[in-house]
Amino acid sequence: MYEPSETRYETMPYNRCGKSGLRLPALSVGLWQNFGVNNDYDTMKEIILTAFDHGVTHFDLANNYGPEPGRAEINFGRIFKENLRPYRDQLIISTKAGYEMWPGPYGGRGGSRKYLTASLDQSLQRMGLEYVDVFYHHCMTPDTPLKETALCLA
């Protein structure tokens, strides 16, 4: 069973994020191309756990990260379930949506309320989480009013 370093918060600086109550580490880990189907699970796990052992508490994903869209969230979810679940309250997990994920009028690139809500639901399922700390829009499109996107993210 994974036991994080007891000194993990001693050397990492944390900064307040805007006007929110979040304090983000000076260094975050983005899980894009190194967390897809072509990558070794043990290496992915080592990257995440080593980062956490050194005070990295923010892990950034997106619904389309892979390769194979969604695969980074699936792999992170497995690592989270097997190792980090007891430390959920110490983590900042962010994900985003905006690129094509499924066929049909609501699965393509966009920022509609329908697309963003469905994308968030799918991301939560892939990661096995009840919530993410930050959800944001990855790619604006001219066919969705900015107000619709902003109200959905509020």
What residue ranges belong to the model's regions?
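N-terminal binding-site loop/beta-alpha segment at the start of enzyme catalytic domains
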Residues: 1-91
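A short, structured active-site edge motif that brings together acidic residues
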Residues: 88-101
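Conserved beta-strand positions
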Residues: 29, 61, 95, 134-137
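Glycine/proline-rich, positively charged
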Residues: 100-154
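Ser/Thr-centric signal marking residues that sit
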Residues: 57, 61, 95, 144, ...
